[in-house]
Amino acid sequence: MARVKRGVVARARHKKILKQAKGYYGARSRVYRVAFQAVIKAGQYAYRDRRQRKRQFRQLWIARINAAARQNDMSYSKFINGLKKASIEIDRKILADIAVFDKVAFSALVEKAKAALA
């Protein structure tokens, strides 16, 4: 039976990890054992933060809508409730965009929400 030499495989695996760790500080980009841990941890952070990004954007949109609604003498919750009663289905991302870039259109939406609540 032939002897199995694993040098090529190990080198390839190490190179792959060190390539992923490129740009990391100090030993994290140079020493395989440290780089491996850093790459694993980076992957965990990336996985977690891909989910958190969605939550954070929703929070941002709600904060922007709330600020714009309050400029028109209405709270966020009453505004959203009014839109639902007026059967206006615009998601929060678009509402936040309108609130930032088209104040006149947002004011019109607020008026429709107020009318639906009255």
Curated annotation (Swiss-Prot):
<dbReference type="GO" id="GO:0006412">
    <property type="term" value="P:translation"/>
</dbReference>
<protein>
    <recommendedName>
        <fullName>Large ribosomal subunit protein bL20</fullName>
    </recommendedName>
</protein>
<dbReference type="GO" id="GO:1990904">
    <property type="term" value="C:ribonucleoprotein complex"/>
</dbReference>
<comment type="function">
    <text>Binds directly to 23S ribosomal RNA and is necessary for the in vitro assembly process of the 50S ribosomal subunit. It is not involved in the protein synthesizing functions of that subunit.</text>
</comment>
<dbReference type="Pfam" id="PF00453">
    <property type="entry name" value="Ribosomal_L20"/>
</dbReference>
<comment type="similarity">
    <text>Belongs to the bacterial ribosomal protein bL20 family.</text>
</comment>
<dbReference type="GO" id="GO:0005840">
    <property type="term" value="C:ribosome"/>
</dbReference>
<keyword id="KW-0689">Ribosomal protein</keyword>
<keyword id="KW-0694">RNA-binding</keyword>
<dbReference type="GO" id="GO:0000027">
    <property type="term" value="P:ribosomal large subunit assembly"/>
</dbReference>
<dbReference type="InterPro" id="IPR049946">
    <property type="entry name" value="RIBOSOMAL_L20_CS"/>
</dbReference>
<keyword id="KW-0699">rRNA-binding</keyword>
<dbReference type="InterPro" id="IPR005813">
    <property type="entry name" value="Ribosomal_bL20"/>
</dbReference>
<dbReference type="GO" id="GO:0019843">
    <property type="term" value="F:rRNA binding"/>
</dbReference>
<keyword id="KW-0687">Ribonucleoprotein</keyword>
<dbReference type="InterPro" id="IPR035566">
    <property type="entry name" value="Ribosomal_protein_bL20_C"/>
</dbReference>
<dbReference type="GO" id="GO:0003735">
    <property type="term" value="F:structural constituent of ribosome"/>
</dbReference>
